[in-house]
């Protein structure tokens, strides 16, 4: 089962304040532990919402609306994420609890969410087969 550890933004991360070298070192050590355990799939930090773009669909069937950042409510923003694959929900919680304070200022907040697997969403064998083809193509593109 896959889980995403969503690192919530703070006013500092939204202002573009970069983490200290001490925090970078702590996060690198943590990521090394995830790699050694064979559970890390991806981990990235995100730029502030001021460089972001939001696409909204104000009404069903209407044209999409493009909105440039910055966006309000830093607590609702995401500053980064770590994607892991583990055997149990409890293991995901254990890894999330081991993550250093993601901002280093005592403001860190991590939201842990389980990722839907393709099988959870697509019960139709034809849809599953099409999805498998797409995933193989993505893997082949990564190798090229």
Predicted regions located by residue number:
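Conserved, structured core segments of small domains
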Residues: 1-144
């Amino acid at each position: 089962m896959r889980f995403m550890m969503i690192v919530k933004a703070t006013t500092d991360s939204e202002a573009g304040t970069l983490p200290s070298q001490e925090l970078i070192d702590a996060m690198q050590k943590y990521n090394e532990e995830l790699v050694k355990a064979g559970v890390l799939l991806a981990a990235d930090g995100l730029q502030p919402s001021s460089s972001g773009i939001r696409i909204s669909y104000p009404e069903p069937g209407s044209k999409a609306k493009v909105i440039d950042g910055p966006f309000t409510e830093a607590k609702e923003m995401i500053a980064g994420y770590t994607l892991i694959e583990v055997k149990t929900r409890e293991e995901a919680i254990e890894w999330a609890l081991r993550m250093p304070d993601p901002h280093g200022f005592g403001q860190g907040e991590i939201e842990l969410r389980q990722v839907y697997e393709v099988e959870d969403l697509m019960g139709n064998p034809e849809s599953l087969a099409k999805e498998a083809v797409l995933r193989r193509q993505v893997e082949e593109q990564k190798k090229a």
